[in-house]
């Protein structure tokens, strides 16, 4: 289907077609992403409500389904107040610097075979590079706000993101070692091989089982990277109110939250791609194979996002020193140790990734 669309477009628009096709693919990513963020927030409020034995949002529309629309309209109608003491240019550009990397990562995330905006061979390297850029927007927001609370939150955010970026990087290196490719589509395809895949049990051939410690480290580090509970000391309400966002209001404030929820979806999608077989069905059987791969990826992302929400409802916020200790004294040594084990495993006679 995609090949027929591209051939028709090339014949119709000529030299303009590559630009038009890129814009169409970008719109097809951004608009559903915004819709997913809106209803992810509703799902979060509903799920936490059920866990707290409450009802959750149920007033706007049937069963509260229009609540995200009401929230967006409320934020759009609020005035963006710019305090007089801030560095105006950097204050305004900081939310965009946080949001743009979160959106840019989706250029290389494969939704199913051949369904990717840009199927580049260095996709994994691209993800690691772009995901580390968002911290600059957070630091800029804290510094430009000219507030001690905002600056303290920005310093916490930068230290926390840098600390857990190392563990996430080592976890992804192990995936690179066992797959031998930086292309995300190749990483998904490489998980459907081996003893279990040959017998139709794809779920046991995915990387989550053979790289179980890396799977846990990557996902938990992703929770810390997104400053989500229980790692949300960056915006600890009882200490520094809203952290680096304290001087923001209206849509400028909303852009930070939009970036946070997009990053949650990014971490879930990358975890599903790296460790849970991406768009692959768990069992190689006709009853599963007729379902498009996109829906399998969607189910995995939804379950991982629900784990994000479950963590928020179940765990208390960690102290800042506990967060740093977990990253530097547990996760980094664990990932380095497992990296060495995988390297030895690959050259041994018991290599299961051949």
From Swiss-Prot:
Any one biological process term the GO annotation gives: aerobic respiration
GO MF entries: NADH dehydrogenase activity; oxidoreductase activity, acting on NAD(P)H, quinone or similar compound as acceptor; quinone binding
Pfam families reported in the protein's UniProt record: NADHdh (PF00146)
Enzyme Commission number: 7.1.1.-
Location within or outside the cell: Cell inner membrane
Catalyzed chemical reaction(s): a quinone + NADH + 5 H(+)(in) = a quinol + NAD(+) + 4 H(+)(out)
Gene Ontology CC entries for this record: plasma membrane
Role according to the record: NDH-1 shuttles electrons from NADH, via FMN and iron-sulfur (Fe-S) centers, to quinones in the respiratory chain. The immediate electron acceptor for the enzyme in this species is believed to be ubiquinone. Couples the redox reaction to proton translocation (for every two electrons transferred, four hydrogen ions are translocated across the cytoplasmic membrane), and thus conserves the redox energy in a proton gradient. This subunit may bind ubiquinone.
Family per record: Belongs to the complex I subunit 1 family.
NCBIfam families registered for this protein in UniProt: PRK06076.1-2, PRK06076.1-3
Protein name: NADH-quinone oxidoreductase subunit H
